[in-house]
Amino acid sequence: MSQELYSFLAGLPQSDIKVSTCTAAGKNLRQIMILLTPSSEQISWSQLKEFTRKNAANALSLSNMVMGMTSILCSLNGHQYSSCWLVLIGYLLDLADGAVARQLNACSALGAKLDDFADFTTFGIATSLLLWSKELMDNILCMCYVLSVFIRLCFFSSGIPFMYRGLPCIYSSAILACVSLLSGGNMAVLRATAIAMILFMVSQSFYPHDRVLESQAWKKVIYAGGVVMVLCSSFPSACVYYLLWSVSYILFPTSLWSCKL
């Protein structure tokens, strides 16, 4: 302690010295608390990061649902080409949402429900409208397709780890969308394809979980190629790409697409 401070304190009454010491300690404590307490900006940034982590996958599911609803509107207004492309975009979003949820440790009951609602909208209702026409039998086929997707989503839990029972509806939808584009909306071809897809979806066959973004590198390359095809490629080559991708899952489910590989 300096000589000046010592002389100053020596001239003060003992009570004043105690008050001064307590006041200084109080100021120091307040400064420490200010340093240790996070600012409102820090709290807001932390909350934003946590909100983003928990809802990134949900945002993808909602985007898938938006694609489905937009596809429905396009079909009702006669824009079949746009409707098919929106279904294919939904296909990519659906493959991504589960992977993002697991990667960020953000799986939840809400996310599972959103995923099912989005799948039913895009791969059930929107895809069925690709079959819609003024013919009564086509309308019945539309309803049968929607019901098969509903049954597939609600009742076909296999109980076997890493396995689905019945063809996942995203693949049947991708095939129908590609066939519609490649055939120019030929109803005879679409009817035959839809009936085959319905049978695959309600069958008792087992298909592996298709965790494309959580498996081998070549599967991630396939997914990246799908994104490039949708954004940059002309429709014939993109349709052939998605058609081969989806058909390979039906023909070689375990040998090619098992998430354990």
State each model region's role:
Residues Q103-R165:
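Internal catalytic or translocation cores that form aromatic/hydrophobic pockets or channels
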Residues M1-W45, Y164-L261:
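C-terminal membrane-associated helical module and adjoining short loops/tails
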Residues K54-K113, T127, I140-V146:
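Membrane-embedded alpha-helical segments that form the functional core of polytopic membrane enzymes
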Residues E50-A59, S108-D115, G159-G166, H209-W218:
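Short, amphipathic, aromatic/basic-enriched membrane-interface segments that mark the entry/exit
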Residues T70-W85, T121-M143, C178-A192, S234-V240:
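Helix-coil boundary and interhelical linker segments in multi-pass alpha-helical membrane proteins
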Residues D97-C107, S148-M163, V202-D210, P253-L261:
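C-terminal ends of transmembrane helices
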Residues A56, L60-V66, L86-I89, T121-G124, ...:
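Lipid-exposed faces of alpha-helical membrane segments in multi-pass integral membrane proteins
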Residues M69, A99-R102, F120, G124, ...:
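Hydrophobic positions within alpha-helical membrane elements
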